[in-house]
Amino acid sequence: MTKAPWVGARPPKPGGGLSSAFTSGRGRSFEDFYRAELPGLVVLARALAPPGLAEDVAQEAMMVAYRRWLTIRELAHPEAYVRRACTNLAVSQFRRHLSEARAFRRSGAPQTVEKLGGPDEFWHLVRTLPRRQRQVVALHYVFDLSVADVARTLEISEGSVKVHLSRARQTLARSMGLAVEVES
């Protein structure tokens, strides 16, 4: 996710960092728009997005507006545009969160993951796996693809998919303090 140049720092002074394309037109600069609308977007995102993601969703909505500011600033209600973008992004995050939760339930290890503190910690462990293992785990468990479908998607052999799944399961089991079952 890309962020505005001043995210995490003070925004530039009026006219001090944005090109004239972003400070002219209808008398409102993007900086003024950002300052006025961001707090409301965060509140909106908190109502719609999974916990802990509201600020990211609001920032991403502002990035959408920033990239299209030349067009958006000419709208009668640019704030409606950015609120809709925020709503769409929050719903997407919520759906992603639900997909992870469903995959977690299908994995057959909810009691084990609950010992870790919940699905967030489990998916944090998944993110520590090597890239190919992460891909295979996500496609197989989140998208519920068969081994053959995962192989076609990643353009690797079915045997490679099985090896990556097996290694990922073993690594995750060790990380969670479970007995590692060797698959034959």
Where does each model-flagged region fall?
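Arg/Lys-rich amphipathic alpha helix in sigma70-family domain 2
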Residues: 70-73, 85-106, 115
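Sigma70-family region 2
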Residues: 51, 62-77, 92, 96-98, ...
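Short, charged helix-capping/linker segments at alpha-helix termini
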Residues: 23-32, 42-60, 69-76
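A short, charge-rich alpha-helical start-of-domain segment used by transcription regulators
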Residues: 2-14, 19-43
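Short, small-hydrophobic-rich alpha-helical interface motif
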Residues: 41, 45, 54-65, 85, ...
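DNA-recognition helix of helix-turn-helix
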Residues: 87, 91, 154-178
